[in-house]
From Swiss-Prot:
Involved in the biosynthesis of ADP-glucose, a building block required for the elongation reactions to produce glycogen. Catalyzes the reaction between ATP and alpha-D-glucose 1-phosphate (G1P) to produce pyrophosphate and ADP-Glc. Keywords: Allosteric enzyme, ATP-binding, Carbohydrate metabolism, Glycogen biosynthesis, Glycogen metabolism, Nucleotide-binding, Nucleotidyltransferase, Transferase. This is Glucose-1-phosphate adenylyltransferase. Changing K195 to E/I/H/R: Decrease of the affinity for alpha-D-glucose 1-phosphate, but no loss in adenylyltransferase activity. The record marks Q74, W113 as: Could play a key role in the communication between the regulatory and the substrate sites. Beta-D-fructose 1,6-bisphosphate binds at K39, R419, E420, M421, L422, R423, Q429, E430, R431. InterPro entries: ADP-Glc_PPase, ADP_Glu_pyroP_CS, GlgC_bac, GlmU/GlgC-like_hexapep, NTP_transferase_dom, Nucleotide-diphossugar_trans, Trimer_LpxA-like_sf.
Length: 431
């Protein structure tokens, strides 16, 4: 393990990102989000009033000083590709800055699409090698968080690791959804199990397990060697968590990086924020978190901006209807192009170009872009997919049986409404 002085840290914080390439795994469908991902990959799902989920990983790279990125796509990639082309095309290739789109290719040696997360990188090795990076940062494109990857790179170099895995404690009852690890006093990973049925607890806290966040730093040459070896293994599932990380752990070359060391927070006393919005309830809750008085995730931090594609839209407008009722909101996010006419919106997130007509009451709802809400509607604890036309007088979120019959209702009572569901009920979706 190498001990570095403060000046060395500052120098490495500038140099290491320039020697790195980030690969963002963005090909997943996200089946637990149900119909929300029928026509788009999970990283392309809207979030936070104006963003896409992948904007967080991309923005973290830019803010960390990493200017070379590859986005690995597969499932329903058109929306994702379009978003990146529109919103992330400001790089200067002459300065060796870029975002490369790396789709599944079905290469000549086989007929498989990506067989796993590791295989997604393996199939693009010929392209990735041309980047001539010293370090490769592997990221999931479907998590919500702010992280300075330069701090993780420094930790990787200081510990003399060949592979570093970002980790954080999670409640033990949730740990089966993650890779779970045990570490020694130097953060060397001594045991790693992917999605165990009975997760081991942390020695100092029996209520929690130490979970992998799916964020990795590799020495580039070591990663390429591992991937080529894994590609030849017919018994491998070609996945980082299931195959590569356990193998590296056995070799004694994997170290853990505690997420609090690199989590970017405006309030140093706040809990580190990282969310896997993989279920409808988690997605709904993470959106509404941003509408709270003091949200856990600070989206207003000028020192760590989250970038996205910005349309040219007029400001949101709140107007009174013909009866004199005023449009008003409380504890809500309302994006550009929205019009609220004589209705009340409480603790909700309205994306761009949403129109709420008179006499409506909207509470704890997430309305994606271009939703049209007819008069006298009541919407509660729901997610309304893009461009839905909610007919006049419709009530959602008040009758569990009725919601489950017409739409998708989760076990937690969150209702998802899509255009296809509304069409099946006989409601036209063209305005």
């Amino acid at each position: 393990m190498v001990s570095l002085e403060k000046n060395d840290h500052l120098m490495l914080a500038r140099q290491l990102p320039l020697k790195s390439v980030a690969l963002i795994l963005a090909g997943g469908r996200g089946t637990r989000l149900k119909d929300l991902t029928n026509k788009r990959a999970k990283p392309a799902v809207h979030f936070g009033g104006k963003f896409r989920i992948i904007d967080f990983a991309l923005s973290n790279c830019i803010n960390s000083g990493i200017r070379r990125m590859g986005v690995i796509t597969q499932y329903q990639s058109h929306t994702l590709v379009q978003h990146i082309q529109r919103g992330w095309s400001f790089f200067n290739e002459e300065m060796n800055e870029f975002v490369d789109l790396l789709p599944a290719q079905q290469r000549m040696k086989g007929e498989n699409w990506y067989r796993g997360t590791a295989d997604a990188v393996t199939q693009n090795l010929d392209i990735i090698r041309r980047y001539k990076a010293e370090y490769v940062v592997i990221l999931a494109g479907d998590h919500i968080y702010k992280q300075d990857y330069s701090r993780m790179l420094i930790d990787h170099v200081e510990k003399g690791a060949r592979c570093t895995v970002a980790c954080m404690p999670v409640p033990i009852e949730e740990a089966s959804a993650f890779g779970v690890m045990a570490v020694d006093e130097n953060d060397k990973i001594i045991e790693f199990v992917e999605k165990p049925a009975n997760p081991p607890s942390m020695p100092n806290d029996p209520s929690k397990s130490l979970a992998s966040m799916g964020i990795y730093v590799f020495d580039a040459d070591y990663l390429y060697e591992l991937l080529e070896e894994d590609d030849r293994d017919e018994n491998s599932s070609h996945d980082f968590g299931k195959d590569l990380i356990p193998k590296i752990t056995e070799a004694g070359l994997a170290y853990a990086h505690p997420f609090p060391l690199s989590c970017v927070q405006s309030d140093p006393d706040a809990e580190p924020y990282w969310r896997d919005v993989g279920t409808l309830e988690a997605y709904w809750k993470a959106n509404l978190d941003l509408a709270s008085v003091v949200p856990e995730l600070d989206m207003y931090d000028r020192n760590w901006p989250i970038r996205t594609y910005n349309e040219s839209l007029p400001p949101a407008k709140f107007v009174q209807d013909r009866s004199g009722s005023h449009g008003m909101t409380l504890n809500s996010l309302v994006s550009g192009g929205c019009v609220i006419s004589g209705s009340v919106v409480v603790q909700s997130v309205l994306f761009s170009r949403v129109r709420v007509n008179s006499f409506c009451n909207i509470d704890s709802a997430v309305l994606l872009p271009e939703v049209w809400v007819g008069r006298s509607c009541r919407l509660r604890r729901c997610v309304i997919d893009r461009a839905c036309v909610i007919p006049e007088g419709m009530v959602i979120g008040e009758n569990a049986e009725e919601d489950a019959r017409r739409f998708y209702r989760s076990e937690e009572g969150i209702v998802l409404v899509t255009r296809e569901m509304l069409r099946k009920l006989g409601h036209k979706q063209e305005r």
